[in-house]
Amino acid sequence: MNRIQLENDYQVIGLDIGRKNTKVYSEFNGEIYGAIFSSIIGDGRDIKFDDYKDPIYISVDNTDYFVGELAEKESYSPTRNSSDSKISLTAKILVHSAISKVAKCDKVRIVLGVPNNAYRKQVLLGIIETYQGKIIKVKDKITNTSKTVLIEMIDIFREGDAVCYDVMRDRINTDKDMAFISVGFRTSEISYFEKGMNFIDRLSKTIPYGNQHILSYVQNKLKENNIVKELHEIDSNVGDYDDLKRIAYELASESFTQKIETIIENSFVQTDVYVAGGTMLHLSLDTRFNTVENPIMSVARGLAYVGSLIF
């Protein structure tokens, strides 16, 4: 892979804050830095961390936070990232956590992924006001190290478009139209391009379909047996309810295909379809779909690449 950031005066970061996971990616001075963690924050305190892989325990503005799995299991009051807002308290702490994970320079420029319906000037202005020109101070309470980082610039980019740039880089489609789909926890983002990489707004949209809809099948089946579980519990409990999950993802593989065929005109005939997102790791799609390599990181990688072009 070509390195996309070679200068050492600032570091470009691609940041994808989802409802389930936060993904951050950067290439700086010939090295790759990345992290994935659950989009959950909560109160933090000193405990033993031996049973946790890559625990996140940080201090921001003299307040201690658990982030990710640690917040989900150990915080007395965990908060999930349940909205599209990138400037809520939860989002701000996730930004601090991402910077703590990958920042290797004291100046960064960030491209933040947003859904189609949030790709607006008003949203951008709110994000710029919240982050741009701000100095981020974050202490890693586990390693007892601190970082002070200036966010020099920040911009937003559609998540589906980010998948496009991750896949295509500087190539231009000349043979067929292309659709790029990022499947998230609650929604899926579609970006559509005609030959020559001309963006088609009419076919680019946010659709209410994601991993939570798939796991609702498991949730309802459990209720039939008087077992009450939240969707995030079903999702995060690896090894539990595997038979029900297998059926859910088999059904979803078929329904997902039908949704795309309905939304995209002449899909699979005149259009190459690329799919990304962590949900793709569970679906069994036919060969007409092109699953992006390491699909859970595709949006963050694409955002970082876009940052190398615009900053």
Give names to the regions the model predicted.
Residues 1-178, 197-210, 238-311:
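Nucleotide/phosphate-binding catalytic cleft detector across ATP-hydrolyzing
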Residues 173-234:
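Aromatic-anchored, glycine/proline-accented short structural segments
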